[in-house]
Amino acid sequence: MNRRWSLTLASSLLMLTCLQAAAGEPAKASSPNASAPPVAAPSAANTNPPAPPAAAPSAATTNPPAPATPPSPESAAKETQLPEISIYGRLDQARNQILPSLGATSYSINETQLDQMPQGDNAPMNQVLLRAPGVAEDSFGGLHVRGEHANLQYRINGVIIPEGITLFGQELDARFVDSMALTTGSLPAEYGYRTAGIVDITTKTGIIEPGGEVGVQVGTYGTVRPFVEYGGSDGKVTYFLDASYDQNDNGIENPTDTQVAVHDNTEQYKLFSYLSYVLDDSSRISLMISATHEDFQIPDTPGLPPGTQPDGNPWLPGTFNSHSLNENQYEQNDFAILSYQKTLGDLNYQISGFGRYSAAHFIPDSFGDLFFNGVASDVNRMLSSGGVQGDASYKLNDQHTLRGGIMVVDELLTSETTTTVFPVDANGNESGPSFPIKDNNYSQALFAGMYLQDEWRVAPKVTINYGGRFDVFNSSFDNEYQFSPRVNTIYKPTDTTTIHAGYARYFTPPPLENVPTSGVTIFNGTSNASPITLDSPVRAESSDYVDAGITHKFLPGLQGGVDAYYKWAHEQIDDGLFGQTLIPSAFNYEKGQVYGVEFTGSYIQGGLSTYANVALSQAKGENWDSAQFLFNPAQLAYVKNNWIYLDHEQSVTASAGASYTWKKTFGGGTMAYADVLFGTGLRADETTSSGEVIPNGDHVPSYYSADVGVEQKVKVHEKQFVKVRLDIVNVIDNSYELRNGTGVGVNAAQYGARRGFFVTLAYDF
């Protein structure tokens, strides 16, 4: 555990200890249970902000009559706490009014729904999001929403988290989530920067119920995952802490079709802390701190033949078993967010400052990589970022609500690369012993955006949300700006039917951490030389996006919806893994298009909760016009004049699940669930009968994975429960490929996880 992690952990534990000592009684940060489908139906046209997570009845804000006798300590504590809960509820509601997702398509998941998913709140965040419509699974925990590569924006309590270098691990823990929403489609003007989807998390806060949870999950792959969460409040102070440790032998997807990969251990440390202080009835400040440190072994593929020079001889003489390769990667992500929120009558605003440090270090097998590849690259990237965000809403009258805001993010990337190569002669053959080439450099990027929009209630059943935003991107490799109009219309012809349609123009800068920084010509005359030396700078993507959909409640508890979208882009951004390092590189397609349709449905009745999603999608691009040195000449020539599928395109993606809850068994309740994921497969290269290779012309075979589980809560004391849970992931042990090692920016085969048994034992108090 390095010094940065140790200091962050120590400071957060000290903060918790001090606050606990000051608190009269701790409070757990869970919201009241309610039966709901694992993925809620879209709330695209919900023009009213959701109710606060735990707003107390209005009566709680009035002072009770003076008691005839002195109150007990317990009743006095309740009388003190209820007004504070009401204040928090009003402030949460005000924050929701600042940043509503008017006209966009939003899928919500709450704490109860998390429990109804495989592994519950121990599930990785990417597995949670895979249950939403149109989300395709990729290797390394990657997600593709509506046919786009990454381009996801994460927010906590409405504040953006600056991007980091998160490649294999899942930085955010589902345990601190009170609720979350994935918002896609034609986004309102407040959303810029990353626009394929907005993952907005509302954290647990420690204001609702007393207690916490401590437990451990054990299971297949040598999994040992202890965890603890604890929340509390005392008057105006509220706090929450979540910490976990994870060790297993399935850190990265297996490159072979076996139960357990070779050399695939991971250790992960995660910490999240939340602190809030109510200044008065209309304002509060809050601080969030997160720290994650993750170590990964890179899994080996046994039986690989040695890499060869053009003359057929191996790069190095002798024998080396690929079973014994020792590549590793270390990742670290820390961030802090400080926010001030204020309500002044019809004016609501929130101002936040944030900072982040992120790093990824790939360490090669210095001998083995030379033997198999002729190249061994040690790559260390460190990204520091900071910025401010301000958002406000003002209700002019019953017909108009204005919203506006700004965001500025400044990033600095340090890249330290040492590449060990062989010298080669004019014929491309080894001509001497290996030697290192150092390439250390810095790059910088500044992103700034501002927006203004109006929510116009044209009629009782019609709302138009229109506005625009202006974005600027200045970096060491590119300088651009754009004005982006946005408009969404919501029509509710009946209480059970909602129709929405919208248009958005997007401006998406390239992720600084993925922009290639190494010089091309410094490798001329070596085993790492590229046959192409053209290296045009990576540019920002500009796109136009239209979206329309309808939702309908057919019967009490039964609802469904359909949503269609089309995007056409200039300088469409993509990225991939090139060479042997596992740090991605970004590039542009001159033109791109993505389109599709999503079908959703859910049914709730008593303890039964079900959902089903099916998404159809196509994503294509033409002509790579940046970072051309990443590709081989044949690929570059083909794509220059031909549209190809993007490597992350999956034509059909589906998910479905059902759960049932018996509330009174053993005083705590029993829950059982089953769900399934299906995909037609990500893209792979196609080889025609004539021997021509078409980039991304084929796809890996279609696949499915089914999961089942059961959870039992046993009441041992008032508000104290023992929880026992069994999850069986991929219950039929289906072996399926995520990648086969071919395709643009794909450098290795990867398989989905095989059957796993996981047992969780926890104590809620």
Regions found by a protein language model. Name each.
Residues 159-185:
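Short acidic/polar hinge/loop motifs at secondary-structure boundaries
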Residues 75, 125-128, 143-144, 167-168, ...:
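N-terminal periplasmic accessory domains that precede
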Residues 343, 348-364, 492, 536-606, ...:
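Membrane-embedded beta-barrel scaffold of Gram-negative outer-membrane proteins
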Residues 251, 677-687, 712-765:
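C-terminal beta-signal and adjacent terminal beta-strands/loops
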Residues 561-568, 585-685, 762:
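Gram-negative outer-membrane beta-barrel transporters
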Residues 26, 32-117, 150, 343:
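Short, acidic, small-residue-rich periplasmic hinge/interaction motif at the N-terminus
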Residues 220-247, 258-299, 328-348, 396-397, ...:
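Transmembrane beta-barrel wall of Gram-negative outer-membrane proteins
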Residues 59, 248, 262-264, 282-342, ...:
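Flexible loop and strand-edge segments within Gram-negative outer membrane beta-barrel domains
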